[in-house]
Swiss-Prot record:
Residues 11-193 form the tr-type G domain. One of its GO terms (biological process) is positive regulation of translation. It catalyses: GTP + H2O = GDP + phosphate + H(+). GO terms for molecular function: GTP binding; GTPase activity; guanosine tetraphosphate binding; ribosome binding; translation elongation factor activity. Its EC number is 3.6.5.n1. This is Elongation factor 4. Required for accurate and efficient protein synthesis under certain stress conditions. May act as a fidelity factor of the translation reaction, by catalyzing a one-codon backward translocation of tRNAs on improperly translocated ribosomes. Back-translocation proceeds from a post-translocation (POST) complex to a pre-translocation (PRE) complex, thus giving elongation factor G a second chance to translocate the tRNAs correctly. Binds to ribosomes in a GTP-dependent manner. Belongs to the TRAFAC class translation factor GTPase superfamily. Classic translation factor GTPase family. LepA subfamily.
Length: 608
Protein backbone atom coordinates (compact mmCIF):
# COMPACT_ATOMS: atom_id res chain seq x y z
CA UNK A 1 0.00 0.00 0.00
CA UNK A 2 1.43 3.42 -0.89
CA UNK A 3 2.25 5.59 2.11
CA UNK A 4 0.04 8.63 2.45
CA UNK A 5 1.80 11.83 1.45
CA UNK A 6 0.70 14.84 3.43
CA UNK A 7 0.29 17.03 0.35
CA UNK A 8 -2.55 15.70 -1.76
CA UNK A 9 -3.97 18.34 -4.12
CA UNK A 10 -7.56 19.30 -3.26
CA UNK A 11 -8.79 18.15 -6.67
CA UNK A 12 -7.70 14.59 -5.81
CA UNK A 13 -9.48 14.32 -2.45
CA UNK A 14 -13.05 13.05 -2.05
CA UNK A 15 -14.75 13.17 1.35
CA UNK A 16 -17.97 11.19 1.50
CA UNK A 17 -20.30 9.42 3.90
CA UNK A 18 -22.75 6.58 3.43
CA UNK A 19 -26.40 7.26 4.23
CA UNK A 20 -28.61 4.22 4.78
CA UNK A 21 -31.30 2.69 6.98
CA UNK A 22 -30.35 -0.02 9.51
CA UNK A 23 -29.68 -3.33 7.71
CA UNK A 24 -29.45 -1.92 4.22
CA UNK A 25 -25.79 -2.90 3.95
CA UNK A 26 -23.89 0.25 4.80
CA UNK A 27 -21.11 -1.31 6.88
CA UNK A 28 -20.71 -4.22 4.44
CA UNK A 29 -20.28 -1.77 1.57
CA UNK A 30 -17.65 0.09 3.61
CA UNK A 31 -15.82 -3.24 4.13
CA UNK A 32 -15.81 -3.91 0.38
CA UNK A 33 -14.48 -0.43 -0.41
CA UNK A 34 -11.64 -0.93 2.10
CA UNK A 35 -10.87 -4.35 0.64
CA UNK A 36 -10.88 -3.37 -3.01
CA UNK A 37 -8.58 -0.38 -2.46
CA UNK A 38 -6.13 -2.47 -0.41
CA UNK A 39 -6.82 -0.70 2.89
CA UNK A 40 -6.44 -3.99 4.77
CA UNK A 41 -5.05 -7.34 3.72
CA UNK A 42 -7.50 -10.26 3.31
CA UNK A 43 -6.47 -11.84 6.61
CA UNK A 44 -7.07 -8.60 8.55
CA UNK A 45 -10.59 -8.13 7.28
CA UNK A 46 -13.25 -8.86 9.83
CA UNK A 47 -16.93 -8.46 9.12
CA UNK A 48 -17.87 -4.80 9.54
CA UNK A 49 -14.40 -3.41 10.15
CA UNK A 50 -15.69 0.03 11.09
CA UNK A 51 -18.20 -1.17 13.68
CA UNK A 52 -15.68 -1.74 16.44
CA UNK A 53 -18.10 -2.34 19.35
CA UNK A 54 -19.61 -5.82 19.75
CA UNK A 55 -23.04 -4.28 20.19
CA UNK A 56 -22.65 -2.45 16.88
CA UNK A 57 -21.98 -5.72 15.10
CA UNK A 58 -24.69 -7.70 16.84
CA UNK A 59 -27.46 -5.20 16.45
CA UNK A 60 -26.20 -4.30 12.99
CA UNK A 61 -26.12 -0.61 13.82
CA UNK A 62 -23.37 1.98 13.81
CA UNK A 63 -23.26 4.09 16.98
CA UNK A 64 -20.08 6.16 16.78
CA UNK A 65 -18.86 7.76 13.58
CA UNK A 66 -15.73 6.05 12.23
CA UNK A 67 -13.45 7.09 9.42
CA UNK A 68 -11.09 5.46 6.95
CA UNK A 69 -8.73 6.89 4.34
CA UNK A 70 -8.40 4.93 1.09
CA UNK A 71 -6.06 5.34 -1.89
CA UNK A 72 -7.73 4.54 -5.18
CA UNK A 73 -6.11 4.44 -8.61
CA UNK A 74 -8.96 5.42 -10.91
CA UNK A 75 -9.49 4.37 -14.52
CA UNK A 76 -8.09 7.74 -15.66
CA UNK A 77 -4.70 6.75 -14.22
CA UNK A 78 -4.76 9.28 -11.36
CA UNK A 79 -4.58 8.25 -7.69
CA UNK A 80 -7.27 9.75 -5.46
CA UNK A 81 -7.55 9.91 -1.68
CA UNK A 82 -11.03 8.85 -0.55
CA UNK A 83 -12.06 9.67 3.02
CA UNK A 84 -15.09 7.68 4.12
CA UNK A 85 -16.89 8.73 7.30
CA UNK A 86 -19.19 5.97 8.44
CA UNK A 87 -22.16 7.63 10.15
CA UNK A 88 -24.74 6.25 12.59
CA UNK A 89 -28.11 5.67 10.93
CA UNK A 90 -30.35 5.85 13.98
CA UNK A 91 -32.46 8.82 14.98
CA UNK A 92 -30.98 9.06 18.51
CA UNK A 93 -27.60 9.90 17.01
CA UNK A 94 -28.91 12.56 14.62
CA UNK A 95 -26.45 15.19 15.87
CA UNK A 96 -23.48 12.87 15.26
CA UNK A 97 -24.84 12.31 11.76
CA UNK A 98 -25.17 16.03 11.05
CA UNK A 99 -21.56 16.68 12.16
CA UNK A 100 -20.22 13.77 10.12
CA UNK A 101 -22.13 14.97 7.09
CA UNK A 102 -20.80 18.51 7.45
CA UNK A 103 -17.25 17.11 7.19
CA UNK A 104 -18.02 15.71 3.72
CA UNK A 105 -19.02 17.10 0.32
CA UNK A 106 -20.99 14.12 -0.92
CA UNK A 107 -22.88 11.01 0.16
CA UNK A 108 -23.63 7.57 -1.13
CA UNK A 109 -27.32 6.90 -0.62
CA UNK A 110 -27.58 3.14 -0.09
CA UNK A 111 -31.02 1.60 -0.46
CA UNK A 112 -31.89 -2.08 -0.16
CA UNK A 113 -33.23 -3.13 -3.57
CA UNK A 114 -35.78 -5.43 -1.94
CA UNK A 115 -36.96 -3.19 0.95
CA UNK A 116 -36.97 0.31 -0.49
CA UNK A 117 -36.85 3.66 1.27
CA UNK A 118 -37.29 3.73 5.07
CA UNK A 119 -38.05 6.60 7.46
CA UNK A 120 -34.51 6.90 8.78
CA UNK A 121 -33.09 7.03 5.26
CA UNK A 122 -35.37 10.00 4.62
CA UNK A 123 -34.23 11.89 7.71
CA UNK A 124 -30.55 11.42 6.91
CA UNK A 125 -30.97 12.21 3.20
CA UNK A 126 -32.66 15.49 4.06
CA UNK A 127 -29.75 16.29 6.36
CA UNK A 128 -27.32 15.52 3.54
CA UNK A 129 -29.29 17.77 1.18
CA UNK A 130 -29.28 20.53 3.84
CA UNK A 131 -25.48 20.24 3.86
CA UNK A 132 -25.48 20.74 0.04
CA UNK A 133 -24.23 17.23 -0.62
CA UNK A 134 -24.03 15.66 -4.03
CA UNK A 135 -25.72 12.27 -3.81
CA UNK A 136 -24.80 9.06 -5.63
CA UNK A 137 -27.59 6.50 -5.38
CA UNK A 138 -26.52 2.90 -4.79
CA UNK A 139 -28.99 0.00 -4.86
CA UNK A 140 -27.65 -2.83 -2.73
CA UNK A 141 -28.58 -6.53 -2.45
CA UNK A 142 -29.52 -6.85 -6.12
CA UNK A 143 -28.48 -10.53 -5.93
CA UNK A 144 -31.54 -11.28 -3.78
CA UNK A 145 -34.49 -12.95 -5.52
CA UNK A 146 -36.82 -10.31 -4.03
CA UNK A 147 -34.84 -7.38 -5.45
CA UNK A 148 -36.84 -5.00 -7.68
CA UNK A 149 -34.35 -2.31 -8.74
CA UNK A 150 -36.66 -0.56 -11.22
CA UNK A 151 -39.53 -0.24 -8.72
CA UNK A 152 -37.18 1.04 -6.02
CA UNK A 153 -35.68 3.62 -8.41
CA UNK A 154 -39.17 5.00 -9.03
CA UNK A 155 -39.83 4.98 -5.29
CA UNK A 156 -36.64 6.98 -4.59
CA UNK A 157 -37.67 9.55 -7.19
CA UNK A 158 -41.20 9.78 -5.76
CA UNK A 159 -40.36 9.82 -2.04
CA UNK A 160 -37.05 11.69 -1.92
CA UNK A 161 -37.37 13.61 -5.17
CA UNK A 162 -33.89 12.92 -6.59
CA UNK A 163 -33.04 11.40 -9.97
CA UNK A 164 -32.19 7.73 -9.50
CA UNK A 165 -32.07 6.66 -13.16
CA UNK A 166 -28.27 6.23 -13.09
CA UNK A 167 -28.18 4.47 -9.70
CA UNK A 168 -25.25 2.07 -9.27
CA UNK A 169 -26.47 -1.53 -8.86
CA UNK A 170 -24.35 -3.56 -6.44
CA UNK A 171 -24.24 -6.48 -4.08
CA UNK A 172 -21.95 -5.56 -1.19
CA UNK A 173 -21.97 -9.16 0.01
CA UNK A 174 -20.57 -10.67 -3.19
CA UNK A 175 -18.60 -7.58 -4.24
CA UNK A 176 -20.57 -7.11 -7.47
CA UNK A 177 -20.47 -3.53 -8.78
CA UNK A 178 -17.94 -2.19 -6.22
CA UNK A 179 -15.57 -0.77 -8.93
CA UNK A 180 -18.52 1.20 -10.35
CA UNK A 181 -19.12 2.73 -6.90
CA UNK A 182 -15.47 3.83 -6.65
CA UNK A 183 -15.60 5.42 -10.12
CA UNK A 184 -18.88 7.19 -9.25
CA UNK A 185 -17.28 8.60 -6.06
CA UNK A 186 -14.36 10.03 -8.04
CA UNK A 187 -16.33 11.43 -10.98
CA UNK A 188 -19.69 12.43 -9.50
CA UNK A 189 -18.82 13.73 -6.03
CA UNK A 190 -17.16 17.17 -5.74
CA UNK A 191 -13.67 17.83 -4.39
CA UNK A 192 -13.37 19.81 -1.13
CA UNK A 193 -12.90 23.58 -1.34
CA UNK A 194 -10.61 25.73 0.79
CA UNK A 195 -10.88 29.52 0.68
CA UNK A 196 -7.60 30.24 2.44
CA UNK A 197 -5.50 27.29 1.28
CA UNK A 198 -2.79 25.71 3.43
CA UNK A 199 -1.18 29.00 4.49
CA UNK A 200 -4.33 30.49 6.06
CA UNK A 201 -4.95 30.37 9.87
CA UNK A 202 -5.96 26.86 10.91
CA UNK A 203 -9.68 26.10 10.88
CA UNK A 204 -10.75 22.48 11.45
CA UNK A 205 -13.99 20.72 12.38
CA UNK A 206 -13.99 18.28 15.31
CA UNK A 207 -15.93 15.36 13.82
CA UNK A 208 -15.68 12.83 16.63
CA UNK A 209 -13.56 11.78 19.59
CA UNK A 210 -12.98 8.53 21.39
CA UNK A 211 -10.87 7.22 24.22
CA UNK A 212 -7.84 5.04 23.61
CA UNK A 213 -6.36 3.25 26.63
CA UNK A 214 -2.78 4.09 25.57
CA UNK A 215 -3.03 7.44 23.81
CA UNK A 216 -5.79 9.14 25.80
CA UNK A 217 -8.48 10.95 23.86
CA UNK A 218 -8.15 10.73 20.08
CA UNK A 219 -9.82 13.45 18.07
CA UNK A 220 -11.05 13.02 14.52
CA UNK A 221 -10.72 16.27 12.56
CA UNK A 222 -11.51 17.62 9.11
CA UNK A 223 -9.18 20.46 8.13
CA UNK A 224 -11.02 23.29 6.30
CA UNK A 225 -8.23 25.89 5.98
CA UNK A 226 -4.59 25.99 7.02
CA UNK A 227 -2.34 23.15 8.15
CA UNK A 228 -2.51 21.08 11.34
CA UNK A 229 1.03 20.09 12.41
CA UNK A 230 2.67 18.11 15.18
CA UNK A 231 3.81 20.30 18.10
CA UNK A 232 1.31 23.09 17.34
CA UNK A 233 -0.70 24.60 20.24
CA UNK A 234 -4.39 24.39 19.34
CA UNK A 235 -7.49 25.89 20.90
CA UNK A 236 -11.07 24.57 20.91
CA UNK A 237 -13.25 27.58 20.11
CA UNK A 238 -16.36 26.23 21.88
CA UNK A 239 -14.72 25.42 25.23
CA UNK A 240 -11.62 27.67 24.95
CA UNK A 241 -9.40 24.79 26.07
CA UNK A 242 -5.79 24.72 24.79
CA UNK A 243 -3.68 21.67 23.98
CA UNK A 244 -0.39 20.82 22.34
CA UNK A 245 -0.65 18.40 19.41
CA UNK A 246 1.46 15.30 20.06
CA UNK A 247 0.75 13.18 17.05
CA UNK A 248 -1.05 13.57 13.74
CA UNK A 249 -2.15 10.75 11.49
CA UNK A 250 -4.79 9.09 9.37
CA UNK A 251 -6.74 5.86 9.75
CA UNK A 252 -6.50 3.38 6.89
CA UNK A 253 -8.28 1.89 9.14
CA UNK A 254 -4.95 1.18 10.89
CA UNK A 255 -3.25 4.24 12.36
CA UNK A 256 -0.61 5.77 10.09
CA UNK A 257 1.44 8.68 11.47
CA UNK A 258 1.87 11.84 9.36
CA UNK A 259 3.69 15.13 9.76
CA UNK A 260 0.70 17.36 9.00
CA UNK A 261 -2.87 17.47 7.66
CA UNK A 262 -3.71 20.00 4.94
CA UNK A 263 -7.01 21.51 3.71
CA UNK A 264 -9.70 18.99 2.80
CA UNK A 265 -8.00 16.15 4.66
CA UNK A 266 -9.52 14.06 7.44
CA UNK A 267 -7.32 12.53 10.12
CA UNK A 268 -6.78 12.18 13.84
CA UNK A 269 -4.73 14.01 16.46
CA UNK A 270 -3.81 13.26 20.08
CA UNK A 271 -2.94 16.02 22.53
CA UNK A 272 -2.95 14.69 26.14
CA UNK A 273 -6.67 15.40 26.43
CA UNK A 274 -7.95 13.67 29.55
CA UNK A 275 -11.68 13.38 28.89
CA UNK A 276 -13.87 13.05 25.84
CA UNK A 277 -16.21 15.55 27.54
CA UNK A 278 -13.55 18.23 26.88
CA UNK A 279 -13.86 17.68 23.14
CA UNK A 280 -17.31 18.47 21.86
CA UNK A 281 -18.39 17.06 18.51
CA UNK A 282 -18.93 19.95 16.07
CA UNK A 283 -16.47 22.35 17.73
CA UNK A 284 -13.95 24.38 15.71
CA UNK A 285 -10.22 23.80 16.25
CA UNK A 286 -7.80 26.65 15.51
CA UNK A 287 -4.16 27.58 16.24
CA UNK A 288 -3.77 29.42 19.53
CA UNK A 289 -1.17 31.94 18.25
CA UNK A 290 -2.88 32.63 14.92
CA UNK A 291 -6.60 31.93 15.35
CA UNK A 292 -9.18 31.97 12.58
CA UNK A 293 -11.59 34.90 12.66
CA UNK A 294 -14.85 32.96 12.78
CA UNK A 295 -15.85 29.55 14.14
CA UNK A 296 -17.77 27.10 11.96
CA UNK A 297 -21.56 27.45 12.31
CA UNK A 298 -24.00 24.92 13.77
CA UNK A 299 -22.14 23.81 16.91
CA UNK A 300 -24.37 22.83 19.81
CA UNK A 301 -23.64 20.57 22.78
CA UNK A 302 -25.78 17.42 22.85
CA UNK A 303 -28.71 17.68 25.28
CA UNK A 304 -30.09 14.57 26.98
CA UNK A 305 -33.76 14.00 26.18
CA UNK A 306 -34.71 10.85 28.09
CA UNK A 307 -33.85 10.20 31.73
CA UNK A 308 -34.03 7.07 33.81
CA UNK A 309 -32.60 5.69 37.04
CA UNK A 310 -30.10 2.81 36.87
CA UNK A 311 -29.61 0.82 40.07
CA UNK A 312 -27.43 -2.23 40.76
CA UNK A 313 -29.47 -5.32 41.71
CA UNK A 314 -26.79 -6.06 44.30
CA UNK A 315 -25.95 -2.97 46.39
CA UNK A 316 -22.32 -4.14 46.63
CA UNK A 317 -21.90 -3.41 42.89
CA UNK A 318 -22.47 0.33 43.35
CA UNK A 319 -18.79 1.34 43.10
CA UNK A 320 -18.30 -0.92 40.06
CA UNK A 321 -21.29 0.75 38.41
CA UNK A 322 -19.85 4.19 39.14
CA UNK A 323 -16.49 3.35 37.54
CA UNK A 324 -18.15 1.60 34.57
CA UNK A 325 -20.27 4.70 33.88
CA UNK A 326 -17.18 6.89 34.12
CA UNK A 327 -15.48 4.71 31.50
CA UNK A 328 -18.47 4.86 29.14
CA UNK A 329 -18.65 8.61 29.54
CA UNK A 330 -15.03 8.83 28.36
CA UNK A 331 -16.30 7.70 24.98
CA UNK A 332 -19.74 9.24 24.93
CA UNK A 333 -20.04 12.83 26.09
CA UNK A 334 -23.79 12.90 25.41
CA UNK A 335 -24.40 10.41 28.23
CA UNK A 336 -24.74 12.14 31.63
CA UNK A 337 -25.28 10.73 35.11
CA UNK A 338 -25.55 11.85 38.73
CA UNK A 339 -26.05 9.95 41.98
CA UNK A 340 -29.52 9.36 43.36
CA UNK A 341 -30.91 7.20 46.11
CA UNK A 342 -34.26 5.48 46.27
CA UNK A 343 -35.96 4.10 49.37
CA UNK A 344 -36.96 1.02 47.39
CA UNK A 345 -33.85 0.36 45.31
CA UNK A 346 -30.99 1.84 47.33
CA UNK A 347 -28.19 3.85 45.73
CA UNK A 348 -27.95 4.30 41.98
CA UNK A 349 -27.65 6.93 39.27
CA UNK A 350 -30.02 9.22 37.40
CA UNK A 351 -28.85 9.05 33.79
CA UNK A 352 -29.59 11.23 30.77
CA UNK A 353 -29.69 9.86 27.21
CA UNK A 354 -30.24 11.11 23.66
CA UNK A 355 -33.17 8.76 23.16
CA UNK A 356 -34.43 5.25 23.81
CA UNK A 357 -31.96 3.37 21.66
CA UNK A 358 -29.14 5.25 23.38
CA UNK A 359 -30.59 4.21 26.77
CA UNK A 360 -30.83 0.56 25.71
CA UNK A 361 -27.30 0.53 24.34
CA UNK A 362 -25.74 2.10 27.44
CA UNK A 363 -27.63 -0.33 29.68
CA UNK A 364 -26.63 -3.29 27.53
CA UNK A 365 -22.97 -2.20 27.46
CA UNK A 366 -22.92 -1.80 31.26
CA UNK A 367 -24.37 -5.27 31.70
CA UNK A 368 -22.25 -6.95 29.07
CA UNK A 369 -18.85 -5.23 29.12
CA UNK A 370 -18.74 -4.68 32.90
CA UNK A 371 -20.78 -7.71 33.94
CA UNK A 372 -23.31 -5.80 36.07
CA UNK A 373 -26.93 -6.66 36.89
CA UNK A 374 -29.06 -3.53 36.65
CA UNK A 375 -32.61 -2.36 37.24
CA UNK A 376 -33.76 0.58 35.13
CA UNK A 377 -36.66 2.70 36.40
CA UNK A 378 -39.37 3.88 34.00
CA UNK A 379 -37.90 6.33 31.47
CA UNK A 380 -39.09 9.93 31.77
CA UNK A 381 -38.59 13.05 29.69
CA UNK A 382 -37.65 16.59 30.71
CA UNK A 383 -40.70 18.59 31.80
CA UNK A 384 -40.69 22.35 32.20
CA UNK A 385 -42.49 23.56 35.31
CA UNK A 386 -43.77 27.12 35.49
CA UNK A 387 -44.22 27.94 39.17
CA UNK A 388 -46.84 30.26 40.67
CA UNK A 389 -44.07 32.60 41.90
CA UNK A 390 -43.01 33.20 38.27
CA UNK A 391 -39.90 31.00 38.32
CA UNK A 392 -39.23 28.17 35.87
CA UNK A 393 -37.52 24.83 36.50
CA UNK A 394 -36.85 21.52 34.78
CA UNK A 395 -38.09 18.21 36.13
CA UNK A 396 -36.03 15.11 35.27
CA UNK A 397 -37.40 12.73 37.85
CA UNK A 398 -41.12 12.41 38.75
CA UNK A 399 -40.15 11.64 42.37
CA UNK A 400 -38.79 15.22 42.69
CA UNK A 401 -42.08 16.84 41.67
CA UNK A 402 -42.86 19.82 43.93
CA UNK A 403 -46.25 20.39 45.57
CA UNK A 404 -49.00 20.77 42.94
CA UNK A 405 -50.23 23.97 44.59
CA UNK A 406 -46.97 25.71 43.67
CA UNK A 407 -47.14 24.79 39.97
CA UNK A 408 -48.96 27.03 37.50
CA UNK A 409 -48.29 25.02 34.31
CA UNK A 410 -46.44 21.87 33.24
CA UNK A 411 -45.02 21.80 29.72
CA UNK A 412 -43.89 18.58 28.05
CA UNK A 413 -41.74 18.01 24.94
CA UNK A 414 -43.47 17.13 21.65
CA UNK A 415 -42.00 15.46 18.61
CA UNK A 416 -42.71 15.48 14.88
CA UNK A 417 -42.73 11.82 13.85
CA UNK A 418 -42.51 10.42 10.33
CA UNK A 419 -43.79 6.87 9.92
CA UNK A 420 -43.50 4.84 6.72
CA UNK A 421 -45.64 1.72 6.54
CA UNK A 422 -47.20 -0.71 4.06
CA UNK A 423 -50.82 0.46 3.72
CA UNK A 424 -52.40 -2.73 5.11
CA UNK A 425 -51.14 -1.81 8.61
CA UNK A 426 -52.28 1.80 8.39
CA UNK A 427 -55.46 1.38 10.48
CA UNK A 428 -53.63 -0.12 13.47
CA UNK A 429 -50.92 2.54 13.34
CA UNK A 430 -53.43 5.41 13.15
CA UNK A 431 -55.18 3.97 16.21
CA UNK A 432 -51.85 3.64 18.05
CA UNK A 433 -50.99 7.29 17.34
CA UNK A 434 -54.44 8.46 18.42
CA UNK A 435 -54.25 6.44 21.66
CA UNK A 436 -50.95 8.20 22.33
CA UNK A 437 -52.55 11.67 22.02
CA UNK A 438 -51.12 12.16 18.53
CA UNK A 439 -52.19 14.93 16.15
CA UNK A 440 -52.16 13.92 12.49
CA UNK A 441 -50.36 16.43 10.28
CA UNK A 442 -50.41 14.66 6.93
CA UNK A 443 -50.90 11.33 5.22
CA UNK A 444 -49.54 10.65 1.74
CA UNK A 445 -49.28 7.51 -0.36
CA UNK A 446 -46.24 6.37 -2.31
CA UNK A 447 -47.22 3.32 -4.32
CA UNK A 448 -48.47 0.79 -1.76
CA UNK A 449 -46.85 2.57 1.18
CA UNK A 450 -48.27 5.27 3.38
CA UNK A 451 -46.19 8.09 4.80
CA UNK A 452 -47.64 9.53 8.02
CA UNK A 453 -46.58 12.69 9.77
CA UNK A 454 -47.76 13.02 13.36
CA UNK A 455 -47.13 15.33 16.29
CA UNK A 456 -46.85 13.25 19.48
CA UNK A 457 -45.89 13.93 23.11
CA UNK A 458 -42.47 12.40 23.76
CA UNK A 459 -43.75 11.08 27.09
CA UNK A 460 -46.05 8.69 25.19
CA UNK A 461 -43.28 7.56 22.85
CA UNK A 462 -40.53 6.77 25.37
CA UNK A 463 -42.37 3.88 26.94
CA UNK A 464 -43.01 1.33 24.25
CA UNK A 465 -44.22 3.16 21.17
CA UNK A 466 -41.49 1.75 18.94
CA UNK A 467 -42.13 -1.86 20.05
CA UNK A 468 -45.88 -1.48 19.58
CA UNK A 469 -45.35 0.05 16.14
CA UNK A 470 -43.15 -2.88 15.12
CA UNK A 471 -45.60 -5.48 16.41
CA UNK A 472 -48.64 -3.87 14.74
CA UNK A 473 -46.82 -3.68 11.40
CA UNK A 474 -45.04 -7.06 11.76
CA UNK A 475 -41.76 -5.18 11.68
CA UNK A 476 -42.37 -3.40 8.36
CA UNK A 477 -43.06 0.14 9.58
CA UNK A 478 -40.16 2.48 10.21
CA UNK A 479 -40.15 5.51 12.45
CA UNK A 480 -38.11 8.67 12.81
CA UNK A 481 -38.58 11.78 14.93
CA UNK A 482 -37.34 15.24 15.80
CA UNK A 483 -38.12 17.13 18.99
CA UNK A 484 -40.05 20.26 18.05
CA UNK A 485 -41.27 22.20 21.10
CA UNK A 486 -42.60 22.13 24.66
CA UNK A 487 -46.40 22.42 24.97
CA UNK A 488 -48.62 22.71 28.02
CA UNK A 489 -50.08 19.36 29.06
CA UNK A 490 -52.67 18.16 31.55
CA UNK A 491 -50.13 16.02 33.41
CA UNK A 492 -50.21 14.52 36.87
CA UNK A 493 -47.78 12.56 39.00
CA UNK A 494 -49.09 9.09 39.76
CA UNK A 495 -47.70 7.43 42.90
CA UNK A 496 -47.95 3.75 43.76
CA UNK A 497 -48.53 2.91 47.43
CA UNK A 498 -47.91 -0.55 48.86
CA UNK A 499 -49.40 -1.02 52.32
CA UNK A 500 -49.84 2.74 52.55
CA UNK A 501 -46.15 3.49 51.78
CA UNK A 502 -45.29 5.27 48.50
CA UNK A 503 -42.74 3.39 46.35
CA UNK A 504 -40.60 6.14 44.84
CA UNK A 505 -39.14 4.05 42.01
CA UNK A 506 -42.59 3.40 40.55
CA UNK A 507 -43.90 6.98 40.45
CA UNK A 508 -44.44 8.37 36.95
CA UNK A 509 -45.86 11.35 35.08
CA UNK A 510 -49.03 10.50 33.14
CA UNK A 511 -51.73 12.37 31.30
CA UNK A 512 -54.80 12.83 33.49
CA UNK A 513 -57.02 10.99 30.99
CA UNK A 514 -54.77 7.90 30.95
CA UNK A 515 -53.98 7.87 34.67
CA UNK A 516 -56.76 5.54 35.79
CA UNK A 517 -56.03 2.89 33.15
CA UNK A 518 -52.28 3.07 33.79
CA UNK A 519 -52.84 2.91 37.56
CA UNK A 520 -55.14 -0.08 37.34
CA UNK A 521 -52.69 -2.00 35.13
CA UNK A 522 -49.87 -1.27 37.54
CA UNK A 523 -51.86 -2.39 40.61
CA UNK A 524 -52.98 -5.62 38.91
CA UNK A 525 -49.42 -6.38 37.85
CA UNK A 526 -48.04 -5.82 41.36
CA UNK A 527 -50.81 -7.95 42.87
CA UNK A 528 -49.58 -10.90 40.79
CA UNK A 529 -45.95 -10.29 41.65
CA UNK A 530 -45.80 -9.46 45.36
CA UNK A 531 -45.96 -12.67 47.44
CA UNK A 532 -48.67 -13.04 50.10
CA UNK A 533 -47.81 -11.98 53.65
CA UNK A 534 -49.44 -12.85 56.98
CA UNK A 535 -51.60 -9.73 56.67
CA UNK A 536 -53.68 -8.06 53.95
CA UNK A 537 -51.73 -5.71 51.66
CA UNK A 538 -53.51 -2.91 49.82
CA UNK A 539 -51.83 -1.72 46.58
CA UNK A 540 -53.03 1.71 45.49
CA UNK A 541 -52.38 4.11 42.64
CA UNK A 542 -52.91 7.70 43.74
CA UNK A 543 -52.76 11.21 42.33
CA UNK A 544 -52.01 13.50 45.24
CA UNK A 545 -54.43 12.37 47.96
CA UNK A 546 -56.93 10.73 45.58
CA UNK A 547 -56.72 6.96 45.17
CA UNK A 548 -57.64 6.11 41.56
CA UNK A 549 -57.12 2.33 41.57
CA UNK A 550 -56.73 -0.35 44.21
CA UNK A 551 -56.04 -4.06 44.46
CA UNK A 552 -55.70 -6.09 47.67
CA UNK A 553 -53.41 -9.05 48.26
CA UNK A 554 -55.23 -11.36 50.66
CA UNK A 555 -53.47 -12.62 53.77
CA UNK A 556 -52.01 -16.05 54.31
CA UNK A 557 -54.18 -17.58 57.02
CA UNK A 558 -53.29 -20.17 59.62
CA UNK A 559 -56.19 -22.26 60.84
CA UNK A 560 -56.06 -21.43 64.58
CA UNK A 561 -59.26 -23.35 65.41
CA UNK A 562 -57.95 -26.70 64.16
CA UNK A 563 -57.10 -27.90 67.70
CA UNK A 564 -60.68 -27.29 69.04
CA UNK A 565 -62.78 -30.44 68.83
CA UNK A 566 -66.47 -29.66 69.38
CA UNK A 567 -66.88 -27.78 72.64
CA UNK A 568 -67.86 -24.18 73.14
CA UNK A 569 -68.17 -21.80 70.18
CA UNK A 570 -66.82 -18.94 72.32
CA UNK A 571 -63.47 -20.77 72.55
CA UNK A 572 -63.16 -20.65 68.74
CA UNK A 573 -64.28 -17.04 68.61
CA UNK A 574 -61.66 -16.07 71.20
CA UNK A 575 -58.86 -17.65 69.12
CA UNK A 576 -60.11 -15.95 65.93
CA UNK A 577 -60.32 -12.55 67.67
CA UNK A 578 -56.77 -13.02 68.95
CA UNK A 579 -55.56 -13.85 65.43
CA UNK A 580 -57.36 -10.80 64.04
CA UNK A 581 -55.75 -8.49 66.61
CA UNK A 582 -52.33 -9.94 65.82
CA UNK A 583 -52.81 -9.36 62.09
CA UNK A 584 -53.95 -5.80 62.71
CA UNK A 585 -50.78 -5.13 64.70
CA UNK A 586 -48.70 -6.81 62.00
CA UNK A 587 -50.26 -4.69 59.29
CA UNK A 588 -49.34 -1.58 61.24
CA UNK A 589 -45.71 -2.51 61.82
CA UNK A 590 -45.10 -5.18 59.20
CA UNK A 591 -42.82 -4.39 56.25
CA UNK A 592 -43.82 -5.57 52.81
CA UNK A 593 -40.90 -7.08 50.93
CA UNK A 594 -41.19 -6.22 47.25
CA UNK A 595 -39.05 -8.67 45.26
CA UNK A 596 -36.69 -7.32 42.55
CA UNK A 597 -38.60 -9.26 39.87
CA UNK A 598 -41.72 -7.27 40.75
CA UNK A 599 -39.89 -4.01 40.04
CA UNK A 600 -38.45 -5.22 36.77
CA UNK A 601 -41.79 -6.60 35.58
CA UNK A 602 -43.78 -3.55 36.73
CA UNK A 603 -41.41 -1.23 34.89
CA UNK A 604 -41.67 -3.38 31.78
CA UNK A 605 -45.45 -3.39 32.09
CA UNK A 606 -45.97 -1.19 29.09
CA UNK A 607 -44.05 -3.51 26.77
CA UNK A 608 -46.95 -5.91 26.47
Amino acid sequence: MNTPSSKTPLSHIRNFSIVAHIDHGKSTLADRLIQSTGGLAEREMSEQVLDSMDIERERGITIKAQTVRLHYKANDGETYVLNLIDTPGHVDFAYEVSRSLSACEGSLLVVDASQGVEAQTLANVYQAIDNNHELVTVLNKIDLPAAEPERIKEQIEEVIGIDASDAVLISAKTGLGIPDVLEAIVHKLPAPKSEGGDTAPLKALLVDSWYDAYLGVMVLVRVIDGTLKKGMTIRMMGTDAKYQVERVGVLTPKMVAMEALGPGEIGFITASIKEVADTRVGDTITEDKRPTAKALPGFKPAQPVVFCGLFPVDAADFEDLRSAMGKLRLNDASFSFEMESSAALGFGFRCGFLGLLHLEIIQERLEREFDLDLIATAPSVVYKLFMTDGSERELHNPADMPDVVKIAEIHEPWIRATILTPDEYLGGILKLCQDRRGIQIELTYVGTRAMLTYDLPLNEVVFDFYDRLKSISKGYASFDYQITEHKEGNLVKMSILVNGEPVDALSMMVHRMAAEKRGREMCEKLKELIPKHMFKIPIQAAIGGNVIARETISALRKDVTAKCYGGDATRKRKLLEKQKAGKKRMRQFGKVEIPQEAFIAALKMSDE
